[in-house]
């Protein structure tokens, strides 16, 4: 039995889950999500708890058991409390501004970079920049009820200007540590 798969998922007071054929629909204060179920897994809802069982002990069913439970737990948490990801934009003149459903970045290129946010993901830029290692840093917070879409959006934003190892300029996750390198030293 999968150690993760056998754990029950507690649904919050304001979270509703309905099994509709091959998918589970979640509804809560932060929005709606639906999760498609793989063929070898069954879901039951009793007394505000959701349990996931596999149909047989094949390798495929065992691998899908814990994965499906985790995806369902993330959906339940997403519609009740939501998810948040913080990024730091570090560099002189590096800025971000949210305009509607797009983020306008100034990242040291000769042109501004416009990033369109996917459906269900919102962004917020910190009001005042702060200094970290003598570089101005602007905070960017992404929020969504869908953990997968939030992670993909954060990866795509980070790839616009990944942090470089010499000065640490670029876009990085707030909790990420950049391994710094020493510059060239001239010999005399």
UniProtKB/Swiss-Prot annotation:
Alphabetized GO MF terms: rRNA binding; structural constituent of ribosome
Function per UniProt: This protein binds to the 23S rRNA, and is important in its secondary structure. It is located near the subunit interface in the base of the L7/L12 stalk, and near the tRNA binding site of the peptidyltransferase center.
PANTHER family documented for this protein: 60S/50S RIBOSOMAL PROTEIN L6/L9 (PTHR11655), LARGE RIBOSOMAL SUBUNIT PROTEIN UL6M (PTHR11655:SF14)
Oligomer status and interactors: Part of the 50S ribosomal subunit.
InterPro entries in the cross-refs: Ribosomal_uL6-like, Ribosomal_uL6-like_a/b-dom_sf, Ribosomal_uL6_a/b-dom, Ribosomal_uL6_bac-type, Ribosomal_uL6_CS
Disulfide bonds: none
Protein name: Large ribosomal subunit protein uL6
Keywords for this protein: Ribonucleoprotein, Ribosomal protein, RNA-binding, rRNA-binding
Pfam families xref list: Ribosomal_L6
Entry similarity comment: Belongs to the universal ribosomal protein uL6 family.
Domain of life: Bacteria
GO biological process: cytoplasmic translation
Gene Ontology CC: cytosolic large ribosomal subunit
NCBIfam families per record: L6_bact (TIGR03654)
